[in-house]
């Protein structure tokens, strides 16, 4: 370190060692941080760090790509800062910690933006060109904001799912999983958004309250003879009598598509006689439902659900239009409950997963499934009574017609949690459409034709082999995989990677050379992007067969885009940076860590697991880390309508990005992360304490050169050895926390270290020695030795989260050393061993600090009484026994420096466990220089205002200390 000039106290002929530092008290973060960002960019800091770690073991944190649309929000900031802290913390261990940021670029939100800006109906190629340009601009904006947060990474070479190479490799991945037999086409109910005009992934569905019409509808008896047999009543009792099996639903719009009824095989059902006619209800629901219907009634017979199997009932709209003149059979279903409603469920197989499965299990052909709702949410014009109406507008009309038919038993408004599109915030439905799926329970075939475990089995085994932070994530993801349906891979969009299949015009069958054709298309996409599929003439690949085939128009689910980045990025576009062959050979898992918000258990974590399970038979990650969502100070979700959103850009501009980083680091990310003005004020205060501690350390090291002034630990004072031993103990804890991706304990312990261990004790004691002993005395240099080691360690602890501040301090602290340029090419500091008996030393000084705390209380009480001003005006007598007495006596006259008094005497206590403190105001004169009250003030007539110690330190051989 350079020798800085020592500041000269004004008008003092007896100077003390008050030094200065270019490290300012005020961080001025909003102004200085952008300068650091530019400096890091100019000197290509990330590249320098990678070069410094060349040949080291890699640590790969694979970036879950944010969507390239709109400005970043506080949730993005949390995510990127967490990743950055982990990369830096791992890098400081000496690992080659690699971070390639990425962006998710295809999909509906960008299509919506293009429609808003340019209108609907553009040719596909034009939509794709404009979408690509739009995404590029959004990425530039987001990248600037991420870099402003102090996030280091390969910003010059990010991965983009719209890069031609990534699009091409995605097609290759599709080809691989098709070869293994995972992909099939089928009719199934999928999440469908009318506004998107497309199927949705599970991760694109959110739930919120919706008010619907709840109705109880009767399906008239059609087979009285079979019912009489089932309930064991005379046929005459039912023949010709009005009767209904009653269902309850909150989706009246599905009634026109009803094709079956479901009962639970083991539930008891009752035949209930009412003035209106006979009703069939679950026995345990009879009393409640009759109240709802306003009917009196009595149970005349009961039977099990199993006995009702295959009995048929008239459609409730049959009397209103011949188009509904059909019978609905009863099918058994274990999923039927009696918690609410009638205990009977109506089944519209086109609009419910369980309905579909039940009807298919009973032999219903795809062609027999009634599906009148079109992709825009409007009934086909051919549907009797309701054709041309949107399903939501049709609900009251359907209720009206049911009322007229005499088959409506109740109707009222009902609020329930319902599926909505996460983009449009509008209600969605299940809708049976022909889609491409990845089968969860398909037995895949390897290259030798041998079948293996299903995708579900492989994925579940992979979860068991993955480490989760926090641990509860394992069960959450396990449950999702265990219960999920087949994955709908296809979408009906324009801005997406095409499912580049050739389908036979008559049969719809895939071309027999589909895997090879996908590779041919991928080569073209690699050169020209997905636009190549639009311009491709099938004859180029199919020759004379071209007239028999047509190009598939579906695109891949965007979760397949991001979910295959382990293939297209780690093994593909960024292979040189991210791929570690040794890790791949060891267990096939390509990334050390995936880190995202808790919603990604059903999103990116989920899709990545499924694609890797299909491609390699293993997860792509060794560990998953999940963080919570940001909420305001009252625990409410961020919402523009509430007005409680917090902009990371605003915080950076007003307080500094360092405050965001410290807030993230100091918060337990495993739960919700609360943020508010009040919370940020507390973070700022915590930052100031750390910064002030750093300023003190750097100031008092500004005339210290470790190469010239280093001393062996045996020549330090005892309190210095204690402080460094305490630092070493804390470093073990800090590094253990970092290893487990725990940041808030590090921040908490660092703040305690600064405020209590350093500011509240060690530095408080040290000031006298630093300021009053001779500048080059062994006592002062010993203190600086300790401060040097403490500062080295502390700056490295801070660097992952207080990156700007650590770098600023480091360039002052490490000036002229090997790693002056940046702290991030160095490693965690190897704190020297200070004492063979470090544990005993720590225990002894722990005891002394407890005594000091008691002494401080007593001094404060006397000060409040007005008997003393500062603690230096006091003289102490301490009575103690046992180990406490031994510890106190071992310090000799140095005890007074530890207790910050002018005198401290120790005697035996009357009882061994007693600690008695007597405070007496000093009667001696005050030394002008050190402010101690001593009997020897003025002993040298040449310096009548100095104590003997200061006289010796300034003009003589200097004082001797051995403990403090």
Curated annotation (Swiss-Prot):
GO CC, sorted alphabetically, is: cytosol
Among Pfam families, the record links this protein to:
Anticodon_1 (PF08264), tRNA-synt_1 (PF00133), zf-FPG_IleRS (PF06827)
Question: GO terms for molecular function, please?
Answer: aminoacyl-tRNA deacylase activity; ATP binding; isoleucine-tRNA ligase activity; tRNA binding; zinc ion binding
Spell out the subcellular localization from the entry: Cytoplasm
Residue positions annotated to bind L-isoleucyl-5'-AMP are 596
The sequence motif named 'KMSKS' region is recorded at 637-641
Among the GO biological process terms of this entry, one is:
isoleucyl-tRNA aminoacylation
Q: What is the lineage of its organism?
A: Bacteria, Pseudomonadati, Pseudomonadota, Betaproteobacteria, Burkholderiales
Instruction: Give the protein's recorded name.
Output: Isoleucine--tRNA ligase
For domains, the record's comment is: IleRS has two distinct active sites: one for aminoacylation and one for editing. The misactivated valine is translocated from the active site to the editing site, which sterically excludes the correctly activated isoleucine. The single editing site contains two valyl binding pockets, one specific for each substrate (Val-AMP or Val-tRNA(Ile)).
Give the protein family. Belongs to the class-I aminoacyl-tRNA synthetase family. IleS type 1 subfamily.
Q: Where is this motif: 'HIGH' region?
A: 66-76
Give UniProt keywords alphabetically: Aminoacyl-tRNA synthetase, ATP-binding, Cytoplasm, Ligase, Metal-binding, Nucleotide-binding, Protein biosynthesis, Zinc
Q: What is its EC number?
A: 6.1.1.5
UniProt source species: Cupriavidus necator (strain ATCC 17699 / DSM 428 / KCTC 22496 / NCIMB 10442 / H16 / Stanier 337) (Ralstonia eutropha)
